[in-house]
């Protein structure tokens, strides 16, 4: 009687290495960023998809503070594009690990906060618990229409959920980065 080698195998749980998890987190986060930036470019060029029936997609920059805010956001876009790639590419090792880690944690926190606050704002308005939501603004002040269509409301919620997804991905990247550093025995 012959025995096959498969009969002698033991099943062990399949676990991914910390580096594989980091690479997957970095790639997923980078794809999210590319889509995020593509939509913003589309909206800056006048596109309306994703905003429902709202008359304007990007408010005009009327003062210096708005222009400075836009420059800060542009800087965040640039950092948010570089960091996910730097996590798992060799050139990323030139960037101190703590900077990459903090960028992931801060980006994940801000995106999650923005996304979840938007969802909560919509829920409070939709249920009638707070007619002006968390912002204190009416629909007309926020969207340009007093009675937005379901399409507009769903579009706004989809954008909020996309922000929250970005937050989750950056937080995943932060955790994976920490695990990868510990597995390599580096803490700095």
Where is each model-derived feature located?
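Membrane-interface interhelical loops and short amphipathic "cap" helices
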Residues: 47-65, 126-154
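Hydrophobic cores of alpha-helical transmembrane segments in multi-pass inner/ER membrane proteins
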Residues: 73-82, 158-173
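Transmembrane alpha-helical insertion/packing segments
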Residues: 2-72
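Loop-to-transmembrane helix junctions at the membrane interface
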Residues: 86-109, 113
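C-terminal TM-helix exit segments that contain a strictly Trp-centered aromatic cap at the helix terminus
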Residues: 35-47, 109-131
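Cytosolic juxtamembrane helix at the C-terminal end of the final transmembrane segment
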Residues: 88-92, 127, 168-188
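Individual transmembrane alpha-helices with interfacial aromatic-anchor signatures
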Residues: 23, 103, 140-166
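Core segments of alpha-helical transmembrane spans in multipass integral membrane proteins
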Residues: 64-86, 105-109
């Amino acid at each position: 009687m012959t025995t096959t080698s498969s009969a002698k195998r033991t099943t062990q749980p399949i676990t991914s290495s910390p580096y594989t998890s980091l690479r997957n987190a970095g790639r997923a986060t980078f794809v999210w960023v590319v889509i995020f930036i593509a939509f913003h470019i589309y909206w800056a060029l006048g596109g309306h998809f994703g905003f429902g029936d709202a008359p304007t997609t990007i408010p005009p920059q009327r003062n210096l503070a708005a222009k400075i805010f836009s420059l800060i956001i542009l800087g965040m876009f640039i950092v948010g594009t570089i960091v996910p790639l730097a996590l798992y590419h060799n050139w990323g090792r030139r960037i101190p690990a703590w900077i990459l880690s903090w960028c992931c944690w801060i980006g994940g926190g801000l995106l999650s906060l923005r996304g979840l606050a938007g969802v909560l704002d919509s829920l409070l308005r939709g249920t009638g618990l707070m007619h002006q939501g968390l912002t204190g603004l009416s629909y007309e002040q926020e969207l340009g229409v007093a009675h937005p269509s379901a399409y507009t409301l769903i579009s706004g919620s989809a954008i909020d959920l996309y922000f929250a997804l970005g937050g989750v991905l950056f937080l995943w990247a932060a955790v994976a980065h920490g695990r990868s550093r510990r597995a390599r025995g580096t803490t700095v």
